[in-house]
């Protein structure tokens, strides 16, 4: 199942990427909210989110 595969992928992802991805995609937090919550700059949040999304997208292609 794709949801199980996504959960497994996120569990194996680096923590710094997983946290940002979950806060944005699951908790629907803004970049500003994430940056304040994690004490990071917004550019760091955007970079980590881009890397996390790239990781997810690469694996999603394998699931098709």
Regions from the PLM with identified roles:
Residues 20-24:
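A short pre-motif secondary-structure segment
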Residues 32:
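Residues within the helices of the helix-turn-helix
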Residues 38-62:
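DNA-recognition helix of helix-turn-helix
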Residues 1-11:
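Acidic, proline/glycine-rich intrinsically disordered inter-domain spacer in sigma factors
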Residues 35:
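The alpha-helix within a helix-turn-helix
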